[in-house]
Amino acid sequence: MNDAKNRPSEFDLIEELFVPLAKSHAGAAELKDDCATLSVSRGYEALYSMDTLVEGVHFFKDDPANLIAKKLLRVSLSDLAASGGVPKGYLLALSLPADISYEWLQSFAAGLSDDQAGYNITLLGGDTTSTTGSLTLSLTAVGEIPAGRAIRRSGAVVGDD
């Protein structure tokens, strides 16, 4: 990995790698605003699930970036599915140490792009920052479900499929 000096600025990274992931949703405002909008269908409720992956805890430093991206997205999407919901989009937060290269970030964005297409979702917004600690990636999946129909963990019983 290269150092942060060889990486584009935060705003250039967003423009080059992440705005393309947000183009299909008008509410994402091409990531130029601090908030995104998302309509929920009449008679539905919104679902949210957030997960964080930390280098050295949830993945190894040499794991392929595209696979880390897919893991990050899928752990939150699986929570929505377990609740009976349909995914609509996601928010992404990246805390990047200086040794993360632009090539690593390109591969990470490509992994997100692949899964976005498969799950018919889009990036809605997020945050990027630098850190002196480990690479830390957080994702909040956003979905919807008919009002009152969310499947809760507290309602599970032995033998449920």
Predicted segments, located by residue:
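Extreme N-terminal cap/leader segments of soluble proteins
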Residues: M1-L67, S83, L92, D114-D115, ...
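Arginine residue identity/basic-tract feature
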Residues: R7, R42, R74, R149-R153
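Alpha-helical scaffold segments in soluble metabolic enzymes
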Residues: D12-E16, V75, D79, G111, ...
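Glycine-rich anion/phosphate-binding loops
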Residues: G27-A29, F60-L77, D99-A110
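Short Gly/Ser/Thr- and Asp/Glu-enriched loop/turn motifs at secondary-structure junctions
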Residues: L31-D33, S76, P87, S134
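Residue-level signal for inorganic ion chemistry
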Residues: T37, S76, G84, L123, ...
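Glycine-rich anion-binding loops of enzyme active sites
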Residues: A46, L53, K88-D161
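A short, N-terminal amphipathic alpha-helix
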Residues: L72-S83, Y119
